Amino acid sequence: MAEKSFDNWKKIVVKVGTSTIVQENSQINLPIIGQLVQTLCALRNQNREVVFVTSGAVGVAINQLGFKERPNEIPRQQALAAIGQADLMAIYNQNFSFYHQITGQILLTYDVFDNPKMLENMLNALRELLKMKAIPIINENDVIAVDEMDHQHSFGDNDCLAAMVTKIIDADGLIILSDVDALYDRNPHEFANAKAIKRVGSITKQVINLASGKSNLGKGGMLTKLKAAKYLLKNDKQMLLLPGSEPDGILKALSGQEIGTLFANEYK
């Protein structure tokens, strides 16, 4: 991966999950959010177009309301999503304003991708935001998408949503920040000698078997990231899986440093 050049990544989708911005004790990780925003603004200063996909609305609300865990009742999850989304955007806007960076919120559901007219309208708005040098901030609309909140048709903590956005806007690549800093040959939480896999050219059954577990506050896990990677590889796109604990790793990886796992077709 050290020899890989990402200079041609001019349009990038960056996705962050709940486990990166909300800690296990339900506290909002403001230092990480600050570093992340600084990194996204640095990408903009490199004249790259940036689309930011974020999870965390429910996790933020859990913190704000002092809940111990994510509730199972869908109406309560909807209410938390509504509260948390407003708080989450306020936190992001406060951080982005320090760098005088304009942002715009886009909330999506599966219906948007299934409806050509709705999809066209969304893309028109997103393209205009990019022309304005704004950073679109995308999240799943959990207030409306009830079926997705009980995880029957979940985007997967926005991993698959980010992959679909990457494809539909013809971005050069997707970067996913995760609580796991790479894909490993075995579970790094259980095996101290687990080794990071630097590059994956196809999502085989063997690769899928490496995925296990998920965070308590979010809906995703390594399996949803592999699902996103498989979708992107099928559409001739690339994906980087990087540690969420080090947002500036995005800049290091794009400069060619060997960080995380790159998912790319063999001929890339």
Curated annotation (Swiss-Prot):
Quote the subcellular location field of this record. Cytoplasm
Per the record, what are the reactions this protein catalyses? L-glutamate + ATP = L-glutamyl 5-phosphate + ADP
Give the Gene Ontology MF terms in alphabetical order.
ATP binding; glutamate 5-kinase activity
Q: Does this UniProt record's set of keywords contain Nucleotide-binding?
A: yes
Biological process GO annotation list? L-proline biosynthetic process
At the top level, the lineage of the source is Bacteria
A Pfam family assignment: AA_kinase
Identify the main location. cytoplasm
Please give the GO cellular component terms listed in this UniProt entry: cytosol
Tell me the InterPro entries matching this sequence: AceGlu_kinase-like_sf, Asp/Glu/Uridylate_kinase, G5K_ProB, Glu/AcGlu_kinase, Glu_5kinase, Glu_5kinase/COase_Synthase, Glutamate_5-kinase_CS
Annotated binding of substrate, by residue: S55, D142, N158
EC number(s) from the headed UniProt entry: 2.7.2.11
Ligand binding (ATP)? K15, S178, D179
Pathway-wise, it operates in: Amino-acid biosynthesis; L-proline biosynthesis; L-glutamate 5-semialdehyde from L-glutamate: step 1/2
The record's keywords, sorted A to Z, are:
Amino-acid biosynthesis, ATP-binding, Cytoplasm, Kinase, Nucleotide-binding, Proline biosynthesis, Transferase
Gene3D superfamilies given in the database record: Acetylglutamate kinase-like
Q: What does this protein do?
A: Catalyzes the transfer of a phosphate group to glutamate to form L-glutamate 5-phosphate.
Say which family it is in: Belongs to the glutamate 5-kinase family.
Return the PANTHER family for the record.
GLUTAMATE 5-KINASE (PTHR43654), ISOPENTENYL PHOSPHATE KINASE (PTHR43654:SF1)
Protein name (Swiss-Prot/TrEMBL): Glutamate 5-kinase
